[in-house]
């Protein structure tokens, strides 16, 4: 997304708010070999999955009978790097939408096993939509830790425009700012990010039409 905005002429100051680290998953092979569906909510979940697959000394044959569902185009592309095509990609890029599509595939068969690979601090929406209709296992695949870096002094107490791709980005960014600092215009990737922004000193919030980097870039360009 940064490269795309720079190509369009934007002057970008990246601020690193988090560090993604994969989690070593105990008994990984046993957890996934019987899965009917494997679900990823982000590209980081995909990366952690294959990291653990390698640690287990296994390969793709371990999950030969599984089907795959993902949230978002970026997640779909990351999975495709491993020569796997996602079976379900909801048009609305949210966990709630994915839960709805998965439930239509399952019907009344509550013995279907679904493994969700997501962040340790992930939103519960996807789990909530599935826990009553299948054998569900939510696996903490990675953690997004605070990046202890300083905000560039050139930013000062007023940020004219800032782009946020998750609610955790919002919380960590404002934690790094001086107490009296504010953001003039914030661009949000989705509802949860917007809700987090509403709790802080932001004059204007513009939310993308759908939860994708492409839609977020379009929102920024429209404002410009």
Language-model segments: which ranges?
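Signature of uroporphyrinogen-III synthase
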Residues: 1-224
């Amino acid at each position: 997304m940064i490269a795309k905005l720079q190509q369009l002429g934007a002057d970008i100051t990246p601020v690193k708010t988090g560090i993604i680290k994969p989690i070593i998953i105990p008994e990984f092979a046993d957890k996934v070999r019987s899965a009917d569906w494997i679900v990823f909510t982000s590209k980081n979940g995909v990366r952690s999955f294959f990291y653990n697959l390698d640690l287990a000394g296994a390969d793709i044959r371990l999950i030969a009978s599984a089907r795959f569902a993902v949230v978002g185009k970026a997640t779909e592309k990351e999975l495709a790097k491993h020569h796997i095509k996602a079976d379900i990609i909801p048009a609305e890029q949210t966990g709630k939408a994915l839960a709805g599509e998965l439930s239509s595939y399952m019907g009344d068969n509550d013995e279907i096993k679904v493994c969700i690979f997501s962040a340790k601090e992930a939103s519960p929406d996807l789990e909530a939509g599935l826990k009553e209709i299948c054998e569900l296992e939510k696996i903490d695949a990675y953690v997004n830790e605070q990046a202890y870096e300083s905000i560039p002094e050139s930013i000062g107490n007023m940020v004219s425009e800032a782009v946020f791709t998750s609610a955790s980005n919002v919380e960590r960014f404002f934690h790094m700012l001086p107490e009296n600092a504010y953001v003039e215009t914030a661009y949000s990737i989705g509802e949860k990010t917007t809700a987090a922004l509403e709790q802080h000193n932001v004059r204007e919030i513009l939310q993308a039409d759908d939860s994708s980097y492409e839609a977020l870039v379009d929102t920024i360009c429209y404002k410009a």
